[in-house]
């Protein structure tokens, strides 16, 4: 990470306070938080972890829509993935931050634990197709290779879970979070 600060005095004060001062976020009962994804996505989980579940959270389809919602006043805070410990920076997010009138006010870490989710009563040996975000498929590749199922990419892990739940086909599964399993009524 890099930060550009104009003068030495400002830089010294920033460094001195960086690890001791945490900015207090202004939260009201009607505070709205926008995140990229759908309920059960890891970005949704980050939003809930940072702001709590009592705040009004809503998802949008694309990263740039988070910045747009903030700039338009449709949301008070936004949550975007910045980096992934196994794959590095999330493509395009830094450009969105630079191109829009938004700033980072905090960070939260979410442990990514992938689960194989199927319709209630489905059996692992019957699974023929697994859906997930490309990164989820990559991170679970050794397991999926042993499973021998066809792998298909979708926009994110929670969308895969939602799709499997709606189709209710015991031969389909999703790689997604435990939270997505809870939200969409799937078995792990």
What are these model-derived regions, one by one?
Residues 2, 6-188:
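Domain-level signature for soluble enzymes in the chorismate/prephenate branch of the shikimate pathway
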């Amino acid at each position: 990470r890099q930060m550009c600060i104009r003068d030495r005095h400002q830089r010294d004060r920033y460094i001195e306070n960086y690890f001791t001062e945490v900015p207090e976020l202004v939260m009201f009962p009607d505070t709205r938080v926008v995140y990229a994804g759908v309920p059960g996505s890891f970005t949704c989980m980050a939003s809930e972890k940072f702001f709590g579940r009592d705040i009004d959270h809503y998802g949008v389809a694309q990263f740039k829509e988070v910045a747009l919602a903030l700039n338009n006043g449709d949301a008070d805070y936004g949550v975007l993935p910045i980096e992934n410990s196994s794959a590095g920076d999330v493509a395009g997010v830094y450009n969105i931050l630079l191109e829009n009138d938004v700033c980072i006010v905090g960070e939260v870490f979410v442990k990514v634990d992938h689960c194989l989710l199927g319709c209630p009563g489905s059996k692992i040996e019957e699974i023929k197709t697994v859906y997930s975000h490309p990164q989820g498929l990559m991170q679970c590749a050794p397991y999926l290779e042993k499973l021998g199922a066809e792998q298909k990419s979708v926009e994110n892990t929670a969308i895969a879970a939602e799709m499997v739940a709606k189709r209710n086909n015991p031969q389909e599964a999703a790689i997604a979070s435990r939270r997505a399993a809870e939200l969409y009524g799937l078995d792990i």
